[in-house]
Amino acid sequence: MSRWLWPWSNCVKERVCRYLLHHYLGHFFQEHLSLDQLSLDLYKGSVALRDIHLEIWSVNEVLESMESPLELVEGFVGSIEVAVPWAALLTDHCTVRVSGLQLTLQPRRGPAPGAADSQSWASCMTTSLQLAQECLRDGLPEPSEPPQPLEGLEMFAQTIETVLRRIKVTFLDTVVRVEHSPGDGERGVAVEVRVQRLEYCDEAVRDPSQAPPVDVHQPPAFLHKLLQLAGVRLHYEELPAQEEPPEPPLQIGSCSGYMELMVKLKQNEAFPGPKLEVAGQLGSLHLLLTPRQLQQLQELLSAVSLTDHEGLADKLNKSRPLGAEDLWLIEQDLNQQLQAGAVAEPLSPDPLTNPLLNLDNTDLFFSMAGLTSSVASALSELSLSDVDLASSVRSDMASRRLSAQAHPAGKMAPNPLLDTMRPDSLLKMTLGGVTLTLLQTSAPSSGPPDLATHFFTEFDATKDGPFGSRDFHHLRPRFQRACPCSHVRLTGTAVQLSWELRTGSRGRRTTSMEVHFGQLEVLECLWPRGTSEPEYTEILTFPGTLGSQASARPCAHLRHTQILRRVPKSRPRRSVACHCHSELALDLANFQADVELGALDRLAALLRLATVPAEPPAGLLTEPLPAMEQQTVFRLSAPRATLRLRFPIADLRPEPDPWAGQAVRAEQLRLELSEPQFRSELSSGPGPPVPTHLELTCSDLHGIYEDGGKPPVPCLRVSKALDPKSTGRKYFLPQVVVTVNPQSSSTQWEVAPEKGEELELSVESPCELREPEPSPFSSKRTMYETEEMVIPGDPEEMRTFQSRTLALSRCSLEVILPSVHIFLPSKEVYESIYNRINNDLLMWEPADLLPTPDPAAQPSGFPGPSGFWHDSFKMCKSAFKLANCFDLTPDSDSDDEDAHFFSVGASGGPQAAAPEAPSLHLQSTFSTLVTVLKGRITALCETKDEGGKRLEAVHGELVLDMEHGTLFSVSQYCGQPGLGYFCLEAEKATLYHRAAVDDYPLPSHLDLPSFAPPAQLAPTIYPSEEGVTERGASGRKGQGRGPHMLSTAVRIHLDPHKNVKEFLVTLRLHKATLRHYMALPEQSWHSQLLEFLDVLDDPVLGYLPPTVITILHTHLFSCSVDYRPLYLPVRVLITAETFTLSSNIIMDTSTFLLRFILDDSALYLSDKCEVETLDLRRDYVCVLDVDLLELVIKTWKGSTEGKLSQPLFELRCSNNVVHVHSCADSCALLVNLLQYVMSTGDLHPPPRPPSPTEIAGQKLSESPASLPSCPPVETALINQRDLADALLDTERSLRELAQPSGGHLPQASPISVYLFPGERSGAPPPSPPVGGPAGSLGSCSEEKEDEREEEGDGDTLDSDEFCILDAPGLGIPPRDGEPVVTQLHPGPIVVRDGYFSRPIGSTDLLRAPAHFPVPSTRVVLREVSLVWHLYGGRDFGPHPGHRARTGLSGPRSSPSRCSGPNRPQNSWRTQGGSGRQHHVLMEIQLSKVSFQHEVYPAEPATGPAAPSQELEERPLSRQVFIVQELEVRDRLASSQINKFLYLHTSERMPRRAHSNMLTIKALHVAPTTNLGGPECCLRVSLMPLRLNVDQDALFFLKDFFTSLVAGINPVVPGETSAEARPETRAQPSSPLEGQAEGVETTGSQEAPGGGHSPSPPDQQPIYFREFRFTSEVPIWLDYHGKHVTMDQVGTFAGLLIGLAQLNCSELKLKRLCCRHGLLGVDKVLGYALNEWLQDIRKNQLPGLLGGVGPMHSVVQLFQGFRDLLWLPIEQYRKDGRLMRGLQRGAASFGSSTASAALELSNRLVQAIQATAETVYDILSPAAPVSRSLQDKRSARRLRRGQQPADLREGVAKAYDTVREGILDTAQTICDVASRGHEQKGLTGAVGGVIRQLPPTVVKPLILATEATSSLLGGMRNQIVPDAHKDHALKWRSDSAQD
């Protein structure tokens, strides 16, 4: 180098300097530089230029060549100073100093030219050799010496190269300004980058030793440049309008510290590596932005597009021949496709992973752009737009989704293009720290006026860096001082940024970026108004990285990859120019985040501003610009994550202030996630929008509920679970998927019709069959009466509804929980969680942070409505078809709903197929689907004692297990704001419970349960076992999968105008079993569950709770109740095939209605208590079978006035029929069970029963017809007046016994006031006491009252408002017997129309009189039919092998007939136990039984009755028991009787309409002195009876009830305890509620003493103050003895019973009236029986003996002769009508004498027939008769028992008898002859015929007598039709034989 140190000449120096300036900078100047214009100091080597304006065109030309997206608008240079060290040119560096450089740029408009081929801006434009040649050739004066050889030129070039490498450029106060004006009237924006100092030099300047040697022929492969910056500031300016003065730019960012950039440039393409590599370091970066600035910067960055996709596509979309590279690409793609086809993997929806779906890569297959296929294009768009559109409901679909998305985060899918990509640029930056402060308001009201200046002054003033510590908490005070307003702040340290650009052929580019954060924190700092301290929300923090490992592993790693490829524009119907696929992966360390909805709402508003797309103004006829099809995949993963869910305080007031501070509760839910992974996919493009999926998975989730200072409670645990269907260890992971579907057209006008739809517009189908709309309710209509029963849909209907709703929802949330455990340690925690979630989280509404007022009031920082949408023209739809569009009825689903959406800018067919038909269905707002594979809910509740006090140290526990459960919810269904649905399903559910469990410490960490039954809890509700359900036991298999065990569907409808919310709740429980456990009322499972769920709602600000109406429909199908008593050896099972509960529940209303419908239910008993699992058919006995039962409960809270207008509690029951199937032992066991349940036997161990001798002695000491010798306190405290009245009644009853049964004496007793108070309507007031002046009137009225009550019910007449007139002496017969006409009114009778009101409907026999008070409690049973089947034998216990018949043993037994095909044992429910005898059966049927029990309030209500009566007698309760028809049927095989007991009717005694066979009425009244217990007035009425008694049936009933009574355990009261007895109350009616039902039916019911009684609370018998048997009951008795029995009843009685034959014996039960008081039901029965027996013995023996044998017919015979002679005389004496008397006598003679004669003749003929049959049997040979002949004889004998209805049938039957007899005789002779011939030949045949001759001779006599009997019977029935009816009821017919 020494030879180059010769001195330079001045001419050369001037030319070199001028040339350098002109060559490098001349064309950028507006004026050409010359030597004269230069300010040169050649000796010092400096050049200076000032105030230079840049040439815009030249600079833009350079920028275009570099593909810069910016262009220069204005450029100015303050000064340029160039210093050349001539003395040390090769050792020192040249300097260029540029001061005051100002560049104003703007985004380039229009396409850019071709790609840049030169990089001279970095390599100084040319080589040094060229520079040397030009320099020496440019105008140098001709030297005197000759030119230097070529070596000198190279040495000169080497010198120049050395000098150029050492040039150092310094920029001072540089300002780069980028302006952007949208051009649509909006204000522009400008961003300035101000650099205080920038130094640019080669790396050789810093370290000359590392510089490569200079070679002018071979330039270095890499160039290294160094940039050093200092004082970098970012400023923002909003361009003002023309008339407004400009404002100074506002600083938005600063770079503190020293910045250094190392630029590495590759000059030789043969070397690997990127062409450009930049590595830099930066101290820290601070940014301060407002929402307005953020939006404007986003628009600026959108305008400054780094890649012009349209220009790129235009350049590269050229047709060219296939080259070698193209062939290689085709070969590579084909190989990959073949390999993928061999593996046979499913097609992935990702266009990068599956080349078959990614047909947009047409350059891989076709080089010519015109060869693309439109079909392939449509298929490609279909595949990209329909990805995961239909969401999955079932778990297997979820597992498929998990497996399909199993790619590891950050790993790119294999792409054949990546191998051919070449690195182009690489950027690596290291930042010491980054802070981004985003203001939440544009103009903060608080803080200093110049916030930006104050902010950056605070940070620039500090000497030390802001990131000196590893904790960010020390920065918070500095930020409080720097920015005292609400903002969101991102703070990061040790930031490493890496950016790489790869390019390839066909215009493909790949951009990848990685960012590492050593520490990271994202905070929201909210400054409430008027506060000095902010409130922080830690959006993202990393508490675990603050230790020593912070530098070892970054807390956040962000990877972003973008692949850009072009799409040919020659493809039809596509306006897309580029396809961009981006993948963003974020790997975090263990992080923590606060989830606060208010903060997220404010943050989302800011992010929404940054993501608003800038749309160009669209005209009517303008063609849409080419758009970019973009697909972005976002992935986030971390080892662990902690999410703290903060519950907001819901504020629904009209104008809430979102900036008033954090409106959050003190409680929070901490969610700890293990291995969380988040994935999202966003797509945008010109085609139809596609759904957006957000997916979050984790392996484990632990939820902890924190309530202020209380200890944290672990309440939730979710974990993965093994797939039971998978062979390997495949897990289901917890998963949350959020799907945001694109918003469909806002109106129905924005739908373009298809071709088929256009045809449909012209031709409408007259009959259009549509499928029903999907619904969560069952489409099968189920009606009950006139009401439709709403039932949840089956699983298929549920799935259809859910999948359709999810697909048509604006936003859907799907949650999969493989294994979940919810723990609720107390009601307080549950109430807190309930209110936080239901009343805070779900009621929270986002604030209106993006208002859209008028432009004048538009705040800065928020876009107007034009920024979000633009108006565009759509195709108008025909109004004719529009009617179907708006048809949202359930029948509006048809095939034409599959219309597709068309893009407005598209041409041709549809772009993509829609998943459903949103054209006819509006979108729902939000839908949720939660799937639980296995789940458990554990709830700890309080345990209370019988007094309602909480027990210490114990608690109740409820555990609910669920398998395969789904929870679905949708709000604003089909766009209707007030409509929503809620569904809950579970294939299997089990409830465990225990009332009292010892307290144990709560777990600090919730473990996953094993889902095994809890050991300390008892199963309460569980799936029915295989052998329990009736259908399951019947072996019905192969019918597929039935409904789920639990199904619930709820429809929620809110009427905002009325503020009424209606819930339609339907619940179905299928094949479930309830295990019943007796417990205290406060400790039952339902009491504890309801008490646990009964929480109070916290008020919500600005929310008025609507009136809630709940319509409840609960359906139980094939369910059962299992009860196993502790101290009774029996197991009880109640099954119900269908059980429906319906109710209307209205909050804040006084009335509540509940209806139960029970269909096909049964009660079973079993004595196998030691076996755990039993079979229903094998081990149980059905004792109760209910066909249909309806139960209605109505409650009323009462009025504020305290008066009752309706009962507080009313129960109504009605049913079809109830069957009771029992033997004596099973019936006794049923009675014992009822007693056990009523006495709550499980809660009281059985005490020692008293000895039988004590019980017998007690019974013998009591006289049945007298009062007890030692009356109880209640009886002793009767007032003196009642005692006197009782004595008078006793004396009168003795006088009545001496009179005939029909005679009555005047009764003058004042006791009449005690006769059913109020049941007389229109009667005069009660008579005064004894001795009063109105005693005679009282006696007359009392007698007439008696007669009237005997004829009918007084209250019936009273209820219909009719009045019976009472007249003195009415009804008393005269002494001489002559009738006397009494004139009541002397004048004419005036008839007044309408005087009596007409009854509205039929008479209600159960209704109380009108003046009775309104009852507080009413129990009504209406038309309940009961059939009691009494079987012989035993259902339980040991049974003999031969199964002897109990009750028919010994000589009483008769040969039983064969059972027909319809016997009861063919029905499995009636098969009973192994010892049940089905041929021994009797049936007791009570048809249409009605019962009413009313309890009246303690205070008497005002009524029309007299005050004196109310003061004397106050009703407490009233009972009415009515049996419309009572029958006892004889079904014994040994008996021919049909009906054992029934109602007797005849022509003389026809049955009255609406008459009841048995009526019992009881009225309990309070005594007048209030000293005793309640007193009862009892009235019984009975209709005439007919008894047909067979001896076997009589003895069977005797044995049955004897065994029944012996098997019933005696009622022994248990220990008196607080829970076993009712508490003493002030209301005397309270203890009567439990006694009312048993007053009429059983005598064992007792009532406890009233609260006003001073007696001990032991139960006392009922005191009957009055007992009346109101009607005289005639009884007709037929008895048929069969055999003598002397072993049980004695010799005489046995002979009498066996030989007696009674026919129409008449008995009468006389009227009874007992007013002297009876204590106990047994005394009442004893009194009635004693009275009736005495009357029968004294007065009715002739009528009883008149039916012995034929005596009845004989008496009728003489009665007819007497009537024939006496009736004319009696009629003549009466009124002189002799002919009328003759007619009556002849009629009586015909009906009595003729029928009696025919009956006697028939008896004689039947006696002859019986004698002939006996002779026939004696003379008949012993040879067997054929079976067919026996069958014919038996059939004829059965028909023989049926008498003909009239003479015609008698003649026909006689003819048939003779004909069949002759045929039978001939057939018998033929059979005997043929059989004898077969055995012995001719001799045998002749012998057989001879042996058959004697019976054949007798046979005509039998036939003649039988035919005569038929004729006589027909004649008798013709004369007396009642005889035929009685015969048909008495004897069995052909159908009854079976």
From Swiss-Prot:
The keyword Phosphoprotein applies. Pfam families: ATG2_CAD (PF13329). Its main location: membrane. Changing V304R: In Mutant 1; abolished lipid transfer activity. In Mutant 2; abolished lipid transfer activity. Changing V193R: In Mutant 1; abolished lipid transfer activity. InterPro entries: ATG2. Residues 1446-1464 have a biased composition (Low complexity). Residues 1242-1272, 1315-1359, 1438-1476, 1614-1657 are annotated as: Disordered. This is Autophagy-related protein 2 homolog A. It comes from Homo sapiens. The gene is ATG2A.
